Regions:
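N-terminal segment of the canonical double-stranded RNA-binding domain
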Residues: 1-14, 18
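A short, exposed loop/beta-hairpin motif centered on an aromatic-Gly-Thr core
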Residues: 23-33
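Short, proline-centered helix/strand-breaking motifs
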Residues: 20-23, 99
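Acidic/histidine-enriched, beta-strand-rich ligand/metal-binding domains
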Residues: 17, 35, 91-92, 126-128
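A short, charged, amphipathic alpha-helix used as a generic interaction element across diverse proteins
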Residues: 31-48
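Short, charged, surface-exposed hinge/linker loops at domain edges
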Residues: 2, 44-96, 101-108, 119-123, ...
């Protein structure tokens, strides 16, 4: 899963990072590279909290979607890849059967986003459950 981040820098300060799709998820770094690295950790921790609280996983929007927001004007945009399979707790090996063409498409899609096959399956499953979850009282 790739989350867009926006990085701002004020004079005499570190780089500040905002994750628009994850309200309350912020980070900072002394350089742009450090800011992005710190954002990866902040996003992973934030998503881990969401998983532990059994809340729906927020689906990231495109940079273009957020670029329209004046709060993010003059920011530097980047995408941060997070492998949900690595943060979703203890993993369990499963055996599934899929059409070869679908498997090939999955692998290519995951590779293009710096994810694993397992991470893609976990992400797709969480998004599907979140989209089809019955409201609870």
């Amino acid at each position: 899963m790739r989350y867009p981040i926006v990085i701002h820098k004020d004079p005499d300060s570190d780089y500040g990072v905002t994750v628009p799709d994850l309200p309350g998820c912020f980070s900072a770094g002394s350089t742009l590279d450090d800011a992005i690295t710190q954002a990866e950790e902040a996003i992973a921790c934030h998503l881990e909290g969401i998983l532990l609280d059994e809340e729906p996983m927020p689906t990231p929007h495109s940079i273009e979607y957020h670029h329209q927001n004046p709060d993010y004007a003059d920011g530097v945009w980047a995408l941060v890849a997070v492998d949900l399979a690595k943060i979703s707790g203890q993993s369990k090996r499963i055996n599934i059967t899929l059409p070869a063409r679908l498997l090939s498409q999955m692998d290519q899609f995951a590779a293009n986003r710096g994810e694993t096959r397992s991470g893609l399956i976990a992400q797709a499953t969480m998004e599907f459950i979140a989209a089809h979850r019955e409201p609870t009282n």
